[in-house]
Amino acid sequence: MTTCVKDHACLFGDVEQGEMILNEYGHVVTKCWYDLTNHYAGITIDAFIVMPNHMHCIIVINNDVGAGLNNTVGAGFKPAPTDKRHGLSEIVRAFKTFSSRYINQIRNTLGMPVWQRNYYEHVIRTEKELQSIREYIVNNPIQWELDVENPQNMKDVGAGLKPASTKLKNA
């Protein structure tokens, strides 16, 4: 999954000599990403990188969450909230909400958007593909000078041009 900062603003830090140096906002994003496992049962945080104006990540959603629950419980009783199945869009929406709230508290800009509305997702189907994407994520700071999300490489920042191989989702 990839999600970008509103207007591609470089909000989370800088890449220096091929290494991502997070600022305070970048650390907030990292903390909020890790905290998702405290709010959603059955998810695992895999590789991720917070870049100056976007984030790449792999999140594993266990589709068996909630399996085996007795969904015919008595009137007024419901399975525990942590047993509920959660889709990627709900998880991304929560992450963006949590991180935006904290960042806006720090910079005293309550209610201002931090993230673009959408995100890019890709379902990983093979171990080979998983390894390739992990390498891409780890090497992203090294490739920053060539990155399509680097504002210096964008011809039409306002047009929201993206690689054709990604799938846009709302969050």
Please give the residue ranges for each predicted region.
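Short catalytic/metal-binding and nucleic-acid-binding patches
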Residues: 2-171
